Amino acid sequence: MRKSLKAAAAGAACAVAGAALYGAGVAGAGQSAANSTHEPYNIGQLVKDIDTYYGTTADADGVYLASPDSPYAKDLARIDAEAERYLDKAARTAHHRGARPAVVFDIDDTLLLSLDYEKRHNYTYDSATWNDYVNKADRPAVFGSPELVRYAESKGVEVFYNSGLTEAQRAGAVANLKKAGADVNLDAGHMFLKDKAAPPAYLKHCAVPGTWNCTTVQYKSGTRRHIEHDLGYEIIANFGDQYSDLDGGYADRAYKLPNPTYFVS
């Protein structure tokens, strides 16, 4: 379930400072659930803080973009640098053991930035406008993420994608990832999207044709389990902007990218 800024303001306020290595012994900047036991952070001030964090500017066409010298970009650069060091070592170790190393990337706000949509829609979600936005296939890349995809591939690491986007949004996602520079393994065997009409057998514990009861964690961790147990890979790293992208195991290490604009439980 995706919660708007208004529904998750308290949690987002804690996350605005950035992101961190998650699930590997290092505490993250943020929290996995909103805390509503006290007066929430003021929304007007939070929006200003978000603009400052992203260094939000509008281009000549009025599209809202993040600044490459913003605190957001600097947080991403730190995460990417650490991840590259880790991937280099972990890939060599896995290959030495005869394992098949893999990485998993979320798409929305992990590879493709949705800041323009969030700002235009006052940080609220609507399925129809979101679908139009995704299928327009014109989102900019999250700073450094396409380079990280290509870096993993260069180290002999198999790249997979695990997204909450739907099968109906596949063409838009593929076109946008190509445009953004993440043109690696964009086939259906490597990009896992939600198929509520015909869910895969490995999700039978929470989804059957026509009935989808999977939480985000069940869907994403179940897909990672499939990659490891059925496809025979060892997921050495998992990247996402939501804690629900990362929870549930089936990855040696997880990286939480910053996103203070919405919360997916």
How would you describe each model-predicted region?
Residues 131-160, 167-173:
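Short, acidic loop-to-helix structural element flanking the phosphoryl-transfer center
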Residues 101-114, 161:
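Asp-based phosphoryl-transfer active-site loop
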Residues 64-74, 131-139, 160-165, 209-214:
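Second-shell loop/turn segments in exported
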Residues 82, 86-93, 114, 118, ...:
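Structured segments of extracytoplasmic/periplasmic soluble domains
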Residues 90-102, 157-165, 186-189, 236-238:
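Surface-exposed patches in mature extracellular/periplasmic domains of secreted proteins
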